[in-house]
Amino acid sequence: MAEFETTFADLGLKAPILEALTDLGYEKPSPIQAECIPHLLDGRDVLGMAQTGSGKTAAFSLPLLNNIDPELRAPQILVLAPTRELAVQVAEAMTEFSKHMRGVNVVALYGGQRYDVQLRALRQGPQIVVGTPGRLLDHLKRGTLDLSKLSGLVLDEADEMLRMGFIEDVETIMAQIPEGHQTALFSATMPEAIRRITRRFMKEPQEVRIQSSVTTRPDISQSYWTAYGMRKNEALVRFLEAEDFDAAIIFVRTKNATLEVAEALERNGYNSAALNGDMNQALREQALERLKDGRLDILIATDVAARGLDVERISLVVNYDIPMDSESYVHRIGRTGRAGRAGRALLFVENRERRLLRNIERTMKLTIPEVELPNAELLSKRRLEKFAAKVQQQLESSDLDQYRALLAKIHATAEGEELDVETLAAALLKMAQGERSLIVPPVAPMRPRREFRDRDDSFDRRGDRNDRGPRGDREDRPKRERRDVGDMELYRIEVGRDDGVEVRHIVGAIANEGDISSRYIGNIKLFASHSTIELPKGMPGEVLQHFTRTRILNKPMNMQLLGDAQPRTERRGGGERREGGRGFGGERREGGRGFGGERREGGRGEGRRFSGERREGRAPGRDDASAPRRDDSAGRRRFGGDA
C-alpha cells in the first residue's frame, strides 16, 4: 500500500523533528501516522480509532509540535491521558520528539506529584502540558494553568477515561478552552458518550480507522507474574534459575536499569551484559558477538538498543518492565522463537500496571496465563538436576585416574579407620557448590498473596481525591491486625528534625526506593540529628546498600541495622513518633504517602497500598467487557513446569 512507502520527510515535518526521529530510529510512518499527520498539519480536527500500540502518540505529537511557536512561553498543546503512567510516557515521547527544537519545554501534571514541583514547572512557561483530568482540572480551578494561548488539544485513550469515570472532568476542561483550537481524539472504541463529545466539541473531524496489525505468536509460550513483595531483581534470579534456556534477553525501560539488572545478575553468577543507547557501536557489536557464540548468556536491553537484534540462541525473553504499548511487547517477544524454534516470554506486571496487561491481551486477542514465583522446592530440584548433569558430564568426558589416586589418599582417617564413602562424597559435593547451597531455604513472602483482579483501573484518582469532597465516616471500617514486633528490625538513618525531615519524607523514601508497601513500615521516631525506623526482617544486603545511598531532602540516609525491634512497652520518649501511625499494617500517616505510593498535599486521600491495591472498604470494580476473561478457578501455573 502507498502509505507504507511514505517517509516522514514526505509528510512535511520540519528538520528538527526529522532529526529527532532519525536519532530515535524511526524509519517510516505507521499507518495511523501516515493518515493523521497531514490532517493535523493542515489544522483539521481528527478522530482516530486505533488500538494502543499503533503509534498514535507520534501521530498527534509530531504535527502539533511542528505547528507550535517556540518563542511563545505559554501552553499551546494540552494532552489529556487517563493515567499518570500514560501521561509520563506521552510527556517523555514529546520531549524526545522536540529535543532539537530550541526553547520547547514539556511538563507532565498528574495526581500524586507535589504541587510546588508542578507550579515551578508551569512558571517556566512550557509549550506542551500533558496531564490527567483530575489534576488538570485542579490547576484550572486554582488559576495556575493558563490555556488562553492553546492551539491544540488531544484526548488520548478517551474510552479509558470514560471507563474510569473521568469523562465529566474531561468535558469540564474542554468547556473552558477558548474557541479556535484544534482537537484530536483517539480511542480504541467509540461508545456513545465519546461520540457526544465529538459532536459537541469537534469541528467536522476527519475519521481515521486503523486495524491492529499485531498478531499472536503460537510458537512462543507467554506468561506473566504479578510483582509483589519480593524485589524484582530477586524474582528475576529465581525465574532464570527455574527456567531452562539457551540465551535470554531482558527488557527494561531505562539505561540505568540495564546496568543495575546486569550487576545484580553478575552477583548471582550469571554471565550477562547491558545493552543501551549510551554504548558505542563497537561495544554493542562485541556484546552481540559474545551472545551469538555462547560466551554471553543474558543481555539486558532497552527497546531502542535492541532494535534489529536477531540471535537464534535466544529462547527466553523477560519483560522486566512492562512496555507501554502492545506493539513494543510483540516486538520484544519476537526476539525469541526464531528459526523455527520454540520460545518463552515472561512478563513482570506490577499491580498498578494491570491496564497495560489488559491492553496487550485485548490487542493480541488472547489471555496470558499467570505463573507463580518459583518456590524453594522447585529451585532445589533444579539445582540438583543441574549439578547431577555436570557430574555425569565429568564421568563421561574426563580422565579421572589421577583424581582416584588422590581420593585413595584421603579415604582413610588419621586413626587408620576407613572413611565412609558417602560422607566423603557429601563433603566434596558441598565444597564443589561453594556458598551456593543445593537446598534452597523457603522465603517468607513480604506480604500476603492476593489474587490479580480484573477490576476497574482507576488508580489515577488517588492523587485527585482531595478535589472530590470528604470521604465520610470511617468508624465502621474493620481495623487491621497489627504485625508482631518480632518480625521487625530497627534501623538508624542519619537524618532528623534539624534537617527539616518529617515522618512523611521517610515513609515516601522507603516505600519508593525499597519497593516496600508503606503498610509494612513500622514505628518511626525522629530525633535531632537522626531517626529510627522499624522494617521487616530479612532485608537483602543490596537493598540496605541502596538505602544507604538514598537521599532524603538531599541528605544521604546512611542506613544501618541496630538490631531487633523492641516491644512497645519497653520504649520511652526521646523522639517524635510518626503522626497518626499505627505501625505495621496500620492506617496511613497524616500528610504522608498513601498506600498507592503517592504524596498528597494535606488530606488523607484515597487509601491504597503502595502496590496499588485498595484497603478494605473499596468500591467494587466494574467488569471490562472488552478484555478477555480470566478463569481464576483454574489457578496459576508454575513457571517452567507443566501448564
Curated annotation (Swiss-Prot):
Residue ranges, annotated region (Disordered): 440-482, 557-643
UniProt-listed PANTHER family: ATP-DEPENDENT RNA HELICASE DEAD (PTHR47963:SF8), DEAD-BOX ATP-DEPENDENT RNA HELICASE 47, MITOCHONDRIAL (PTHR47963)
Record's protein name: ATP-dependent RNA helicase DeaD
Domain Helicase C-terminal: 232-379
Parts forming coiled coils: none
Compositionally biased tracts (Basic and acidic residues): 448-482, 567-643
Catalytic activity: ATP + H2O = ADP + phosphate + H(+)
Gene name of the record: deaD
Alphabetized HAMAP family for the sequence: DEAD_helicase_DeaD
Main EC class the enzyme belongs to: hydrolase
Keyword RNA-binding set for record: yes
Residues spanned by motif Q motif: 6-34
Example GO BP: RNA catabolic process
Binding site for ATP: 50-57
Disulfide bonds: none
Cited function: DEAD-box RNA helicase involved in various cellular processes at low temperature, including ribosome biogenesis, mRNA degradation and translation initiation.
UniProtKB keywords: ATP-binding, Cytoplasm, Helicase, Hydrolase, Nucleotide-binding, RNA-binding, Stress response
PROSITE patterns xrefs: DEAD_ATP_HELICASE, HELICASE_ATP_BIND_1, HELICASE_CTER, Q_MOTIF
GO molecular function, one term: RNA helicase activity
Domain Helicase ATP-binding: 37-208
EC code(s) of this entry: 3.6.4.13
Chain location of the short sequence motif DEAD box per the record: 156-159
Family classification: Belongs to the DEAD box helicase family. DeaD/CsdA subfamily.
A Pfam family that the UniProt record links to this protein: DeaD_C
GO cellular component: cytosol; ribosome
